[in-house]
Structures are given as C-alpha cells and as structure tokens.
C-alpha cells in the first residue's frame, strides 16, 4: 500500500461559505503556453479564471484546479476543472453563466458544462483515469488539420505497434518515459494503449490512472521507432525495464496530443479516491 502522503496540496473540500463548481472544457492549445498560469504568457488557466471572476461578479480572483495539466500546444476535448466560489453564486443560473463564459472567452476555449460539484469532488485527486490520443498523418497533413496531427514520412506498421504497446500495460514504473521532477512518482497503471488506422493516418489511444510529465509523448515516440521498423516489438518493454530516463527516447511534438476524457469515481467514493490518489506510490506495489 502507498505510504507517504503528498504535501502542500489544495484542501479536499471547499472552505466555509464556499461551494465547489465543476467545469468541463475543450480547447485548441495552439496559441496557449499550456494550461498553468505564467507571467506575461497566455495560458488556458489565466483566461478561464479571468472569465469566471467576471461572469460571477466576484471581487477576489478565482483559483482553478485542473484534472489534467497540459503543456504548451497540447489540446483538450475533455478537460475538467474545479473552482471554489462564494455560496452566493447558487442564485445564478449556471446555464446562463456557461453561456456568458463562452462569450467572454476567445473562440479557442469552450465551456462544455458547468455544475455544482458533488461532495468530495476534486478535479485532480478524485480522478480514476485520464485518456489521451495522439495523431499522425500519412505524409504532409491536410492544412485544415495541421495543428492537430504530426506528419509521418514512413508507413507505420500498426500491428507491430499494437504488439509492442500491449507489453507496457498494467502497473509499472514508467521512469524511462518521464522527465525528472523533484517530487512525485513514475509508478502508473496503464489500462489502454492501442493504435488504429484513421481517415488521415494513424492514432494512438492511451488511458491510465495518471500520467507523469511528458510520459505520453515519450511512449509514443518510442513506439514510432517500432512502427517505422527501426526497432523490434520488444524494444519499448526493454526501455521500460531500465527504469531510467533514456536519452534515445524521442519526445514527440505537443500538437499531436489531445486530452480526450477524465473519468471520476462514483459520488459515494470521491473522498476515498482523493485519499488513494494523494498517497505517494512506491515500488512495493509493483513487487507485490
């Protein structure tokens, strides 16, 4: 079982006099410097927080917590955030507020849904799965899709990539595919990783309980070497087993990546899920 607990995290529940809102978002990440607020840069978080403050007529700034933090250029079809706001907003029509938010936001961000979150909901810590897709075009992409697909100049062997991807499924230490961070862990459960042919090329779909920094783009980069015939189907598993970040693993461009969906625990299990997620995982889980 996990032992140590992550510190300096936001409270599990809203403070006295506040309620928690859940907002579902979609955005084109092309012109954003990622999700997280950064001084003098346009980010999704800063744009959404400004719009929330205006739409709800709040004097104090709004702070949002995101379910899946995205890097510069990464897109989202199913992002989820929460924000704690004064109880007075309960007098508002959330449908009208969502409409107002979409009027305040630029066209590359859209509010898909806005509701009062159930007890125990936390956009980050109550999640049980996150799903991403990564798309390649066959050769030069259609100009209308160039911001969402990465060109592949060689025919990709989808069967070989699926064979290699299957070897990475389950609970593993994905350090070999994650950029180093001071905190956290690289132990993840990869539930889905498959490839399919699309109208424009090839798409990978990955779903895990969580992903560490650059994990999706690095795994995809590793698998492309298999699809192009440069490596055998056992190569990604050999890289995984090193448990060391490999310089030879290419991190693919951001614009081919889309956060598709975040799945949450049932309402009656939200608080329990927070406790599980906040616990830092260690190698003993894999050994057992």
Go through the PLM ranges and name each one.
Residues 2-288:
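Structured-RNA-binding interfaces characteristic of tRNA pseudouridine synthases
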């Amino acid at each position: 079982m996990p032992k140590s607990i992550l510190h300096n995290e936001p409270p599990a529940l809203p403070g006295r006099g506040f309620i928690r809102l859940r907002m579902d978002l979609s955005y084109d990440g092309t012109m954003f410097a990622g999700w997280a607020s950064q001084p003098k840069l346009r980010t999704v978080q800063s744009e959404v927080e400004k719009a929330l403050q205006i739409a709800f007529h709040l004097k104090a700034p709004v702070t949002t917590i995101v379910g899946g933090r995205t890097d510069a250029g990464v897109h989202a079809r199913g992002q989820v955030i929460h924000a704690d706001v004064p109880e007075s907003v309960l007098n508002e029509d959330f449908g009208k507020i969502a409409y107002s938010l979409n009027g305040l936001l630029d066209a590359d961000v859209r509010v898909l849904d806005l509701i009062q979150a159930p007890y125990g909901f936390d956009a980050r810590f109550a999640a049980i799965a996150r799903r991403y897709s990564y798309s390649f075009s066959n050769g030069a992409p259609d100009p209308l899709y160039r911001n969402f697909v990465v060109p592949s100049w060689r025919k990709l062997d989808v069967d070989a990539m699926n064979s290699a991807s299957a070897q990475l499924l389950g609970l593993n230490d994905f350090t070999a595919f994650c950029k180093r961070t001071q905190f956290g862990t690289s132990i993840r459960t990869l539930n889905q990783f498959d490839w399919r042919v699309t109208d424009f090329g090839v798409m990978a779909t990955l779903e895990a309980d969580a992903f560490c920094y650059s994990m999706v783009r690095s795994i995809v980069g590793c698998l492309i070497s298999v699809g192009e015939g440069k490596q055998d189907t056992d190569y990604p598993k050999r890289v995984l087993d090193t448990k060391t970040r490999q310089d030879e693993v290419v991190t693919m461009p951001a614009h081919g990546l889309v956060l598709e969906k975040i799945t949450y625990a049932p309402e009656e299990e939200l608080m329990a899920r927070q406790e599980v997620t906040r616990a830092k995982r260690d190698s003993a889980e894999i050994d057992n």
